């Protein structure tokens, strides 16, 4: 196996034929998944895409979702106000702001993508279900509240429905630091008797969320904490850089061993979130799928190495600059085999998007999912657009058809929605994508950015009545 995520020939897995058919901010972003009143009209939005147009031009990448959803809770640890820059306009950020405000913090808009957060007035240490259910990353409030106050009560998290993603490793880390964790009816109560104490933490598996939560909890603990088998993702390094800019002593972030010497005081800071590698990769794939030519700006090319490696094997031309990459296609797309891995391997968050691209390639491609559960839920929707994909467990075999056809589809999670956007852009005809609140969780103004590249895309409101069969129709 190579670290860039490409499967060697000997690692390919046969797929059973029997499974062939298995099936902006500050209050302006409203979550479409929120429950409404009994008599209210259940409105939502959909994207309507007329495909077949090449994407051309430049696109600016926003701040990293996976970094900012940990950095915002981390401001709880500060003993002074913090300024956070390059904040993406996504619904997950608005949820973080809502939770901070509910806890007692103030969130003040300073300029586009820039906010001042003052958490010194926090009096509540509880994050209720109605807030936590909207975002899986709400669990970072556990580490931040516990690390600063020695107590928290946080509901089990929500977010994308990607199968069994327990928080046992998070609780293991807290326990190692001296906390007592109790789970009762979906609420997690975490307390300490004499404060948190530094300790050695070894994770049973590589886990991004637990690594970041352990950092949050340990940064003010008494003594030295050593985290082994730590995840290495760029957003972990960004969280550590943010905390270090406040006076924390975190060493080794980005390696599998992180050392944290606890401090008593963290000053305020002004810090810019890193660019989003997954958003960058998504636009890179969209450019390739449409045969376009796009300059993807405000990126860190080193964070894109595994994505670039795989795309080049598929036949995509990529030019790298200091803080940008240019994506173009000069010839046919070709098959490849990929396995997702923790960083620096090919990211699971790019797997659905690259699958959509491989539907347009020549030959048989294979993808083995090595990180997430149920990451292939989008496959049935791509099949509606003419994709030939067989799934057996954690392996998908894609027979490149060279073309896709527009169809009505639904996003089942964030990255699945991105894959359907890419497929719709490349397809012949019109594609409508519903449940786009998933997409808006992690992509800032995707509609506007794509339209600026030449895409024919429109956001339209839909109502429940559109999904109710008429009297002469079968309910199905």
Task: Show which residues each predicted segment covers.
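Short, structured segments at the rim of ligand-binding sites
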Residues: 2-476
């Amino acid at each position: 196996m190579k670290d860039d995520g490409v499967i060697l020939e000997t690692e390919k897995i046969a797929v059973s034929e029997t499974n062939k058919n298995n099936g902006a901010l500050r209050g302006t972003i409203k979550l479409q998944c929120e429950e409404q009143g009994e008599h209210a009209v259940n409105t939502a939005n959909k994207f309507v895409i007329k495909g077949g147009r090449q994407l051309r031009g430049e696109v600016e990448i926003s701040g990293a979702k996976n970094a900012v959803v940990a950095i915002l809770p981390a401001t709880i640890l500060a003993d002074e106000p913090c300024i956070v820059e390059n904040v993406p306009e996504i619904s997950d950020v608005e949820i973080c702001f809502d939770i901070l405000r509910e806890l007692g913090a103030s969130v003040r808009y300073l300029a586009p993508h820039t906010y001042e957060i003052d958490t010194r007035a926090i009096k509540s240490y509880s994050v209720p279900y109605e807030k936590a259910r909207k975002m899986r990353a709400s669990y970072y409030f556990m580490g931040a509240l516990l690390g600063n106050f020695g107590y928290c009560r946080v509901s089990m998290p929500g977010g994308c429905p990607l199968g069994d993603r327990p928080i046992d490793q998070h609780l293991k880390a807290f326990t190692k630091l001296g906390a007592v964790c109790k789970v009762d009816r979906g609420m997690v109560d975490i307390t300490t008797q004499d404060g948190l104490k530094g300790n050695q933490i070894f994770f049973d598996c590589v886990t991004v969320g637990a690594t970041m939560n352990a950092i949050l909890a340990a940064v003010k603990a008494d003594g030295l904490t050593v985290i082994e088998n730590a995840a290495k993702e760029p957003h972990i390094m960004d969280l550590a850089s943010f905390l270090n800019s406040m006076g924390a002593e975190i060493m080794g972030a980005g390696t599998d061993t992180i050392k944290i010497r606890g401090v008593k005081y963290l000053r305020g800071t002004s810090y810019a979130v890193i660019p989003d590698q997954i958003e960058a990769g998504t636009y890179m794939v969209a450019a390739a799928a449409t045969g376009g030519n796009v300059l993807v700006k405000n990126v860190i090319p080193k964070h894109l190495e595994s994505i670039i490696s795989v795309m080049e094997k598929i036949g995509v031309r990529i030019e790298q600059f200091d803080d940008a990459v240019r994506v173009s296609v000069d010839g046919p797309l070709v098959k490849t085999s990929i396995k997702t891995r923790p960083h620096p391997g090919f990211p699971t968050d790019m797997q659905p998007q690259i699958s959509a691209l491989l539907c347009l390639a020549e030959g048989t491609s294979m993808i083995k999912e090595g990180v997430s559960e149920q990451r292939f839920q989008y496959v049935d929707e791509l099949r509606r657009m003419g994709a030939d994909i067989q799934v057996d467990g954690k392996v998908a075999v894609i027979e490149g058809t060279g073309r896709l056809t527009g169809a009505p589809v639904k996003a089942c999670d964030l990255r699945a929605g991105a894959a359907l956007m890419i497929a719709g852009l490349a397809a012949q005809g019109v594609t409508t994508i519903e449940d786009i609140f998933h997409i808006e969780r992690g992509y800032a103004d995707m509609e506007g950015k794509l339209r600026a590249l030449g895409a024919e895309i429109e956001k339209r409101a839909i109502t429940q009545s559109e999904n109710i069969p008429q009297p002469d129709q079968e309910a199905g």
